[in-house]
C-alpha cells in the first residue's frame, strides 16, 4: 500500500493572520509621508496619520461594533441550524439525496454554483452564505469528496456572481451612486460587462472545482487537506455508511420544506425588487420584520431565522427546555466564527483612522493619469486589488474610489462603465481569497479548512480569473 504523502499546511490560525495584518498596517502608516490638514480637514492624498499603539490594539475591538448586525445574524443562524440538526431531517435528507444521485454526485456542483452566483450578481450574497459552508460540507463529505469542494462551491459560486455584479445594489449600485453629479453612465453597458464577467468567472470556477472533485472522489488520498484538517473534517462531518433502506418520515419532509422555505424567503428578502420596478412584494413581511421583502438586511434575516427555528421546533414537538438548550448550543458553536468576522473588520477601522485608504486612492489616481490607454484597465484593476485587501466591503470601496476614478476615466476618454466594473471585479476577486473578509474566514472555519490550505488550492484559480478579467476589461475599456 502506498504511503500517504504528508500534506503541508500553514499553521497560523485565522485570528493570528488577521492580527498580524492589522499590526502591519500600523507599521506601514509610519513609513509613509505625514498627512497635511487645513482647518482640521485632510488635504486629500497628502499622506497618512501614523497609528498610535492604542489605535492598533483597539481596532479589532472596534471591529465588533462595525460587525454587530452580521454577528447577531450568524449567531441566530447557528441556533437555527442546531434545531434543524437535532430533528435528524437534514442528515437523513442528505443521505437520501446522495443515495438517489449515486454515481452522479458531481452533477450537483455546477447547479449549486450557478444558483449561488445568481444570488451574488443580483444582490451581492456573501455574509449570507456562512450557513451553507456547514450544510454543503456534510453533503460533499457524504458524497466522497472533501470540504475544499464544499467551500469552493459556496465561495467561488457566490464570489463569481459578486465579481460580475449586474444589478447588485451593494457594488454596482453603490459605485454608480457615488459618481459625481453629471457623470453619464449607461446602465445597459454595465449589465452587459457584468454578465460577461460573471459567466466567464463562473465557467473558470466550475472547471477547477469539478477537476479537483473528480480527483478526490476517485482517490481520497489526493486531497489537499492536511492530516489535521482531515481528522477535524471526519470528526465534524464524517458519518457512517448510508443504509440501503434510508428514507424520510413525514415530519422530516415537512421540516426540510420549512428549512428550504427559510432560505428562499431570506434570498427574496435581500433582492432589491424596487430597483427593477417590481412592487409585488411591497407590504409583505412589513408587519413582521418592519421591512418589506426586498428591503431586508441582517436584522430582518436574524428575526426570520429565529421565528422559523421556533416553528420547526413546534412541528417536531420539541419541549421548551430542549429547544432553548439546543438553540443556545448552536449559537455557542458560532462564537469562533463571529470573533473572526468581527476582528477582520478591524483592518478597515485602522485604514480609516490613519487615512491610509485616502492616501492610496488619491495617489493611484495621479498614477493613472499618465498611463497609456491599453494599460489603463490593467493598472486600475491592480490598484483596486490592493485597495480591496484593505477595504473588502464593496460598498465601502465604491464610496471611497468611484468619486475619484470615475471622473478621471471620463476626462481621459475611457469608458466610465468599464471603469466602474473594473472596481467591482477587482473587489470581487480579492473577496475570493483575502483574510480581511470575515465571511471567508468564518466560512472556512466552519468547513474545517485552514486559511493557508485555501490559499494553496485557490491561488491558481484566482490567478486564472484575474488574467481573464484583465483581458475582458481591457477590451471593454477600448470598445466603449
What are these model-predicted stretches?
Residues 5-22, 141-155, 246-259, 326-337, ...:
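Alpha-helical transmembrane segments and their helix-start/interface "positive-inside/aromatic belt" motifs
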Residues 27-54, 274-286, 354-363:
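Interfacial/capping segments of alpha-helical transmembrane domains
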Residues 53, 65-71, 99-111, 143-149, ...:
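Membrane-interfacial loop-to-helix junctions in multi-pass transporters
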Amino acid at each position: 500500500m502506498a504511503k500517504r504523502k504528508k500534506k503541508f499546511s500553514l499553521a497560523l490560525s485565522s485570528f493570528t493572520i488577521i492580527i498580524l495584518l492589522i499590526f502591519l498596517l500600523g507599521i506601514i502608516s509610519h513609513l509613509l509621508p505625514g498627512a497635511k490638514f487645513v482647518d482640521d480637514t485632510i488635504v486629500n492624498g497628502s499622506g497618512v496619520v501614523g497609528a498610535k499603539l492604542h489605535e492598533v490594539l483597539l481596532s479589532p475591538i472596534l471591529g465588533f461594533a462595525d460587525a454587530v448586525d452580521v454577528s447577531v445574524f450568524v449567531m441566530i443562524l447557528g441556533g437555527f441550524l442546531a434545531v434543524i440538526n437535532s430533528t435528524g431531517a437534514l442528515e437523513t435528507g442528505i443521505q437520501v439525496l446522495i443515495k438517489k444521485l449515486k454515481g452522479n454526485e458531481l452533477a450537483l456542483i455546477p447547479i449549486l454554483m450557478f444558483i449561488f452566483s445568481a444570488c451574488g450578481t443580483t444582490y451581492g450574497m456573501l455574509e449570507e452564505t456562512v450557513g451553507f459552508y456547514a450544510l454543503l460540507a456534510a453533503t460533499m463529505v457524504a458524497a466522497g469528496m472533501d470540504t475544499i469542494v464544499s467551500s469552493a462551491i459556496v465561495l467561488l459560486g457566490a464570489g463569481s456572481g459578486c465579481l460580475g455584479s449586474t444589478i447588485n445594489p451593494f457594488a454596482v449600485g453603490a459605485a454608480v451612486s457615488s459618481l459625481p453629479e453629471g457623470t453619464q453612465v449607461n446602465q445597459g453597458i454595465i449589465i452587459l460587462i457584468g454578465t460577461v464577467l460573471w459567466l466567464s468567472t463562473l465557467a473558470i470556477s466550475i472547471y477547477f472545482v469539478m477537476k479537483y472533485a473528480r480527483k478526490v472522489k476517485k482517490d481520497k488520498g489526493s486531497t489537499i487537506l492536511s492530516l489535521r484538517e482531515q481528522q477535524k473534517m471526519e470528526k465534524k462531518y464524517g458519518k457512517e455508511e448510508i443504509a440501503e433502506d434510508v428514507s424520510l418520515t413525514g415530519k422530516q419532509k415537512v421540516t426540510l420544506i420549512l428549512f428550504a422555505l427559510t432560505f428562499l424567503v431570506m434570498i427574496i428578502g435581500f433582492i432589491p425588487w424596487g430597483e427593477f420596478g417590481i412592487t409585488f412584494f411591497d407590504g409583505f413581511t412589513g408587519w413582521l420584520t418592519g421591512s418589506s421583502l426586498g428591503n431586508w438586511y441582517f436584522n430582518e434575516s436574524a428575526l426570520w431565522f429565529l421565528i422559523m427555528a421556533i416553528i420547526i421546533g413546534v412541528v417536531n414537538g420539541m419541549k421548551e427546555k430542549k429547544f432553548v438548550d439546543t438553540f443556545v448550543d448552536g449559537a455557542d458553536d458560532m462564537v469562533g466564527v463571529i470573533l473572526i468576522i468581527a476582528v477582520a473588520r478591524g483592518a478597515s477601522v485602522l485604514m480609516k483612522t490613519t487615512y491610509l485608504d485616502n492616501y492610496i486612492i488619491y495617489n493611484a489616481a495621479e498614477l493613472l493619469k499618465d498611463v497609456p490607454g491599453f494599460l489603463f484597465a490593467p493598472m486600475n484593476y491592480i490598484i483596486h486589488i490592493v485597495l480591496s485587501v484593505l477595504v473588502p466591503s464593496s460598498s465601502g470601496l465604491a464610496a471611497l474610489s468611484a468619486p475619484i476614478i470615475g471622473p478621471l476615466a471620463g476626462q481621459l476618454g475611457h469608458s466610465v462603465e468599464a471603469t466602474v466594473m473594473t472596481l467591482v471585479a477587482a473587489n470581487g476577486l480579492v473577496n475570493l481569497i483575502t483574510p480581511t473578509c470575515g465571511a471567508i474566514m468564518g466560512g472556512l472555519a466552519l468547513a474545517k479548512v485552514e486559511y493557508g490550505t485555501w490559499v494553496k488550492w485557490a491561488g491558481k484559480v484566482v490567478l486564472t480569473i484575474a488574467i481573464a478579467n484583465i483581458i475582458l476589461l481591457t477590451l471593454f475599456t477600448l470598445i466603449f
